[in-house]
Every structure is written in C-alpha cells, then in structure tokens.
C-alpha cells in the first residue's frame, strides 16, 4: 500500500511539473544567432557592404564639413590704410548682432551699432583718421571698407535672397529702403535732413557714407524719406531700415538649393 501510494504521488507530481513547465515553441529552439534580423546591407555581398559603408562615412564627413562651414559664417575682413586714415573692418553676415565699433566719430559708431543690432551682423570696426580736420575722410573710408567686407563675405552670392526691402519708423520719421545685391552700384537717395549737424556729425556725410558703401559692395540701393522732422530720427531710421533690408537680402533661400539668384547664372561687378 505504501509503495502504491508513493507511486501515485510521484505520478501526480510528474504530471503537475509537466503542466507548470514552460512550453517551448519552434522559435525557442533556434540558435540565438538565427533570431537576429539581418539588415539589408548585411545581406549584400562583402564588396557592396564595403562600398555602402564608405558612402556612409563620406556622407557623414560632408555633413560635418557643411556644419563646420555654417558655424564659421560668411565673414569679410578688410584693412584700409591711407595717409589720411587707418581702418580695419570685419563683418560676419551670420552673426548674432554683436556691435564693436570705435571710429573716432561717436554718432557714426551709434549708427554702426544699428547696422549690427538690426541686421544681426557681427560688425567690428576700428578706425583712426584726420578727424582734427573733419570727419569726411574717416566716414568715407569706413564705408568703403564695409562695402568691400560685404563683397568678400557674400562671395559668389549662391543661395541668397538677393533683394531686400524694409520700411522703418522712428517716432515721426519713416524711411523706406530697397536694395539689390546685383553687382551694379547705384544709389538713389532722397533724405531731407533739416539740420546741418547731429552733435558734431555733419549730416551731409550720410549720403556720402552710403555712396561709398554702394561703390565697393556693388549693390543697388534706394533710400526714401516718407516722413520725418528730427534729424537724428531720420538718420537712425535710415540705418535701421538699411540693416533690415540687407539682412533680408543676404539670408539664404532654402528653395534655391545654393544656386545663384540670377537668370544669367552670375552676379558680379564686371
């Protein structure tokens, strides 16, 4: 009886163990290596896999190079030295609006700050000149250097918008600026500044500044006064509108895919 009972217990335990034992399917019996899903490239012949990996490395390298180039920004740097002035200018078109100007002409420094801040350009200007005579030569040579720096920073002008248009108010003053980075220098200037000076700055030098900048940058620039009575407001609104229009023109258009924005396929001074 005891042997019979023990046998029954063992038989019952064995049945219970079988019920509790996890059931293994066919997939559980396969080697672990066989369960790894092969990628498309792993099923390719060895020489094709090597070529695919090479293309991937090249793509990553090009992407890194492009990112590095964008990080550096489009920068133009110019040094102009004459018997009258010593001027250095550096402009980053892809900057953040850093203004760093010391021209020896306080009001002009204030206007260059507007160019940097509202254009989101990094503008570095250092100048010494014969300001003991007047501001004419320093004002002119700074503008010539800025125009040349813009020309260098733009390069072949691939992918840019090319055109810029902006109207800026400053209290009672309202100034409209329209420009084209065409490679053809032209200035249309229509400001009526009521006073001869703002501080020590001769207001006649505003037109001369933009004419000099146009000559070396090769841009077509139109400046129109729609309203304004205060000389400071008129001039400052002009620089703000110019900065915003230039920012618009120099920014890249992703739809262009890096092509030159001209039906001729080229934008140049010649």
From Swiss-Prot:
Region (Disordered), start-end ranges: 250-270
Compartments (UniProt record): Plastid, Chloroplast
Keyword Metal-binding: yes
HAMAP family: HisB
Protein name: Imidazoleglycerol-phosphate dehydratase 1, chloroplastic
Keywords carried by this UniProt record: Acetylation, Amino-acid biosynthesis, Chloroplast, Histidine biosynthesis, Lyase, Manganese, Metal-binding, Plastid, Transit peptide
Cofactor note: Binds 2 manganese ions per subunit.
Modification type N-acetylserine: residues: 63
Catalytic activity: D-erythro-1-(imidazol-4-yl)glycerol 3-phosphate = 3-(imidazol-4-yl)-2-oxopropyl phosphate + H2O
Major localization class: plastid
Pfam families the record matches: IGPD (PF00475)
Targeting signal (transit peptide) range: 1-62
Family: Belongs to the imidazoleglycerol-phosphate dehydratase family.
Top EC category: lyase
Residues the entry annotates as binding Mn(2+) 1: 110, 137, 232, 236
Binding site for substrate: 84, 110-118, 136-140, 162, 184, 232-240, 262-264
Biological pathway: Amino-acid biosynthesis; L-histidine biosynthesis; L-histidine from 5-phospho-alpha-D-ribose 1-diphosphate: step 6/9
An annotated GO cellular component: chloroplast
GO BP term (any one): L-histidine biosynthetic process
Gene designation per UniProt: HISN5A
UniProt GO molecular function: imidazoleglycerol-phosphate dehydratase activity; metal ion binding
Listed cofactors: Mn(2+)
């Amino acid at each position: 009886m005891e042997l019979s009972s023990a046998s029954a217990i063992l038989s019952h335990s064995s049945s219970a163990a079988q019920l509790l034992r996890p059931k293994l399917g066919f997939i559980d019996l396969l080697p672990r290596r066989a369960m790894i899903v092969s990628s498309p490239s792993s099923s390719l012949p060895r020489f094709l896999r090597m070529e695919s990996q090479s293309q991937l490395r090249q793509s990553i390298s090009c992407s890194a190079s492009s990112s590095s180039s964008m990080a550096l920004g489009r920068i133009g740097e110019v040094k102009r030295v004459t018997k009258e002035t010593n001027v250095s200018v550096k402009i980053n078109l892809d900057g953040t609006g850093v203004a760093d100007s010391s021209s020896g002409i306080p009001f002009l420094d204030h206007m260059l700050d507007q160019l940097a801040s509202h254009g989101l350009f990094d503008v570095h200007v250092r100048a010494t000149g014969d300001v003991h005579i007047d501001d004419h030569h320093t004002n002119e040579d700074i503008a010539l250097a800025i125009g040349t720096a813009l020309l260098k920073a733009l390069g072949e002008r691939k992918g840019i918008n090319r055109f810029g248009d902006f109207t800026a108010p400053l209290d009672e003053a309202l100034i409209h600026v329209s420009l084209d980075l065409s490679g053809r220098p032209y200035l249309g200037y229509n400001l009526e500044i009521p006073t001869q000076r703002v501080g020590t700055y001769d207001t006649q030098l505003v037109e001369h500044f933009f004419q000099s900048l146009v000559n070396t940058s090769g841009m077509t620039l139109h400046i129109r006064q729609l309203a304004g009575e205060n000389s400071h407001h008129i001039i400052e609104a002009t620089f703000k509108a110019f900065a915003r229009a230039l920012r618009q023109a120099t920014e890249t258009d992703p739809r262009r895919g890096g092509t030159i924005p001209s039906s001729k396929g080229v934008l140049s001074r010649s």
